[in-house]
């Protein structure tokens, strides 16, 4: 009897395992989850809203071609230097495989798309970096393509718009990558000396050698809301100076407050803002409602 009493509590309980609904995967390509508020949206509707979250207004990344489409008159974009790809000058192990993988994943040849287009009937040169490709890192091809489009704009007296999105210099190309900082800056100096307009449009994230070169030297520097902009990482800086940094440090709003940006522009106002600037520079009448 006592044996049965003690064994009574040792019997296994019957239960059913319920799967956590949070582990269910969202169908690939059909839905997109906002990385900030976690709201799930139809990818098509999100794309039509320029990848701006309907719920929290977070600006998700925008591909290079989608951004060009958003700021160009229909059918006016002409791409330059398509097909230019990186070599492996330092014989860095696995570099070619990583480049090929990113090409297959993104449909891009490199981390920047360049060319000319028109906005409001005004022709301009454009370069748009795409962080999906090697985190938008700047190697020899990125630097060369940017220099070529800047030099074209200088020769043909065109304004130039550059959208940056980058983790910095590409480590697999070593000093050749770092050289692109000076190389692109020289091309921009020639463009500036010719009295031409350069608009730097900084998007999330823009760090390292890109933030320390062409991204920061526009005649007009714009950015998207909450974009991460900086050189070294937050933790590195705090450990170096032994101080706690402000919570909004290295954000677009922080840089605007400290005079390093001219304006933080919502993506829905991107096209109208750029068109107004181009028209002012061309001496044309600007729509006051823009």
UniProtKB/Swiss-Prot annotation:
Under which pathway is this protein filed? Lipid metabolism; malonyl-CoA biosynthesis; malonyl-CoA from acetyl-CoA: step 1/1
Q: What does the cofactor field's note say?
A: Binds 1 zinc ion per subunit.
Instruction: Tell me which residues make up the CoA carboxyltransferase N-terminal domain.
Output: 30-290
The record ties this protein, via SUPFAM superfamilies, to: ClpP/crotonase (SSF52096)
One of the protein's GO biological processes: fatty acid biosynthetic process
Which HAMAP family does the record cross-reference, listed alphabetically? AcetylCoA_CT_beta
Q: Which family does it belong to?
A: Belongs to the AccD/PCCB family.
Q: Give a short account of what the protein does.
A: Component of the acetyl coenzyme A carboxylase (ACC) complex. Biotin carboxylase (BC) catalyzes the carboxylation of biotin on its carrier protein (BCCP) and then the CO(2) group is transferred by the transcarboxylase to acetyl-CoA to form malonyl-CoA.
Q: What is this protein called?
A: Acetyl-coenzyme A carboxylase carboxyl transferase subunit beta
Q: Which organism is it from?
A: Staphylococcus carnosus (strain TM300)
């Amino acid at each position: 009897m006592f044996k049965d009493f003690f064994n009574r509590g040792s019997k296994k309980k019957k239960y059913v395992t319920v799967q956590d609904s949070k582990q269910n995967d969202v169908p690939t390509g059909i839905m997109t989850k906002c990385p900030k508020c976690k709201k799930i949206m139809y990818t098509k509707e999100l794309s039509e809203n320029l990848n701006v979250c309907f719920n929290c207004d977070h600006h998700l990344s925008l591909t290079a071609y989608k951004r060009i489409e958003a700021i160009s008159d229909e059918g006016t974009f002409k791409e330059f230097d398509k097909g230019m790809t990186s070599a492996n000058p330092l014989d860095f192990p696995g570099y070619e495989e990583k480049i090929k993988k990113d090409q297959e994943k993104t449909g891009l040849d490199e981390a920047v798309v360049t060319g000319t287009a028109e906005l409001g009937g005004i022709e301009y040169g454009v370069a748009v970096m795409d962080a999906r490709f090697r985190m938008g890192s700047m190697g020899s091809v990125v630097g060369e393509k940017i220099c070529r489009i800047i030099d074209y704009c200088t020769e043909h007296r065109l304004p130039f718009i550059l959208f940056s999105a980058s983790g910095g210099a590409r480590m697999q190309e070593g000093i050749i990558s770092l050289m692109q900082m000076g190389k692109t800056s020289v091309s921009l100096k020639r463009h500036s000396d010719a009295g031409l307009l350069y608009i730097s449009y900084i998007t999330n994230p823009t760090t390292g050698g890109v933030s320390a070169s062409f991204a920061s030297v526009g005649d007009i520097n714009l950015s998207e809301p909450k974009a991460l902009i900086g050189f070294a990482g937050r933790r590195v800086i705090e450990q170096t100076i032994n101080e706690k940094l402000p919570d909004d440090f290295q954000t677009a709003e922080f840089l605007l407050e400290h005079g390093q940006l001219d304006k933080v522009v919502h993506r829905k106002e991107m096209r109208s803002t750029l068109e107004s600037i181009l028209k002012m520079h061309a001496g044309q009448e600007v729509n006051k409602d823009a």
